[in-house]
């Protein structure tokens, strides 16, 4: 059989890996085997937390809305507010409502007056 010369393929792969892991601490940025393990862990965490970020922001918006609703006495509860929004077919999502609640309370009052039964 003929000999296969691989050239610098392995070095290229390790260099690419080293660039990815250059910000890691200790042996995780120096040793190839631990670099590969940490890279896998980092990518798994990034993938998992992209989904978690969406849930966290939704929770934040709901918490902000609930706080403003209780503080101002616009409604008795958050879920009655959302329920009435859907009944009146107002297409405002939680993100927009939270922004309105923080920055423009008078607009929130007009929305609540619009949807009150």
Curated annotation (Swiss-Prot):
Belongs to the bacterial ribosomal protein bL20 family. CDD domains: Ribosomal_L20 (cd07026). Keywords: Chloroplast, Plastid, Ribonucleoprotein, Ribosomal protein, RNA-binding, rRNA-binding. Its main location: plastid. Gene3D superfamilies: 6.10.160.10, Ribosomal protein L20. It comes from Arabis hirsuta (Hairy rock-cress). One of its GO terms (cellular component) is ribosome. InterPro entries: Ribosomal_bL20 (IPR005813), RIBOSOMAL_L20_CS (IPR049946), Ribosomal_protein_bL20_C (IPR035566). This is Large ribosomal subunit protein bL20c. It is found in: Plastid, Chloroplast. The keyword Ribonucleoprotein applies. One of its GO terms (biological process) is ribosomal large subunit assembly. Pfam families: Ribosomal_L20. Binds directly to 23S ribosomal RNA and is necessary for the in vitro assembly process of the 50S ribosomal subunit. It is not involved in the protein synthesizing functions of that subunit. PANTHER family: 39S RIBOSOMAL PROTEIN L20. GO terms for molecular function: rRNA binding; structural constituent of ribosome.
């Amino acid at each position: 059989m003929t000999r296969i010369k691989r050239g610098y393929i392995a070095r290229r792969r390790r260099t690419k890996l080293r660039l990815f892991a250059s910000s890691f601490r200790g042996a995780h940025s120096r040793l190839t085997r631990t670099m590969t393990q940490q890279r896998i862990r980092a990518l798994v965490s990034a993938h998992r937390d992209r989904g978690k970020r969406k849930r966290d922001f939704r929770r934040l918006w709901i918490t902000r809305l609930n706080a403003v609703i209780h503080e101002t006495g616009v409604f008795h509860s958050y879920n009655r507010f959302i329920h009435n929004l859907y009944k009146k077919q107002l297409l405002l999502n939680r993100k927009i409502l939270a922004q309105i609640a923080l920055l423009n309370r008078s607009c929130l009052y007009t929305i609540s007056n619009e949807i009150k039964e």
